[in-house]
Design a protein with these regions (language model features):
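N-terminal, charged low-complexity regulatory/assembly segments
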Residues: 1-167
Length: 167
């Protein structure tokens, strides 16, 4: 049995060989908020648990998680990096400059998938400037870079939770 995959120009244009640090962070947060019963992840989840708890006190992690219901995630939350040298700062600039129409469309999808969302989070997500607010959530006060897990953020990445200017 042969498998044939056809790839067009648009597919190739959207292909990247660079990992998105914000995508890695989004999924690390999702794992920490709703830990799966996966033995292979248990050591990382235990190591990252305290840092995650601290982050929930420093930043509005609930807003980021609300944009990532099971089986779906808002695209503007973790833009595709232009290349391997793209910084978290570059990506946060992209998040901030998300067109309002795109952000509101993606928020609407997230809201439909979570009809019982907390009223405070719903107000934030449906308000003006949601993309800028999300960029602020990625960079809580503190002026430092720290990871959820020492040298690694996700269970298999080297992405860092950046909290300082120019990170």
């Amino acid at each position: 049995m042969a498998l044939r995959i056809e790839v067009g120009n648009e597919d190739l244009t959207m292909s990247r060989f660079a990992l998105s640090p914000l995508w890695e962070l989004t999924h690390a947060l999702r794992l920490l908020a709703h830990p799966p019963d996966e033995p292979v992840l248990r050591p990382w989840l235990l190591r990252a648990r305290d840092r995650y708890q601290a982050l929930t006190r420093e930043a509005d992690i609930a807003v980021i998680l609300a944009l990532n219901p099971p089986g779906w995630g808002a695209d503007f939350l973790a833009p595709v990096p232009a290349g391997v040298s793209t910084t978290i700062g570059n990506l946060l600039d992209e998040v901030r400059s998300t067109p309002a129409e795109q952000a509101h469309h993606e928020v609407a999808v997230a809201l439909r998938r979570q009809p019982h969302m907390d009223a405070r989070i719903r107000r934030i997500l449906t308000g003006d400037g949601v993309a800028g607010y999300v960029a602020t959530c990625w960079r809580p006060p503190g002026g430092r870079c720290s990871s959820l897990n020492g040298a690694r953020c996700g269970p298999s990445s080297n992405a860092t939770w950046c909290t300082g200017p120019g990170s």
